[in-house]
């Protein structure tokens, strides 16, 4: 059983007609089953793990939604506290990575900087592809993504970077690193 429109199998269409489908940009290609996300754009429906996005936007914070997407359930109070603690302590990037930011030209797009910097994380965590480190690497990536994104933006506008601080929430820290300046802090 499928949610949304009834699917047409491209393989069945090929078998019946001998014609293959061409879908530039996969604009009409759908994954028929997903335990993570359901989207019906025509009806304005977006669900994560069965929860309507409106409910999550009103009642859950970003770290809880990230936890839901990764682990399949909203965290208990204890799980949430532990998750937030891990995201906080892993939010700093290696100091040597700061040199990489200086190598980008002043007009480099922040997304180009961000993607290059995320790729460079594997150089600092050589065991990133080992199964026993999966949870730790998930935490590191989520925790450091906000720091790298903020530093990328600061680089693109020529402002000094702001380090993360442990007393702020994930989103408050991100906004602070994006828009604060050392002279005003």
Each predicted region: which residue ranges?
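Hydrophobic alpha-helical bundle cores within soluble ligand-binding/oligomerization subdomains
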Residues: 1-185
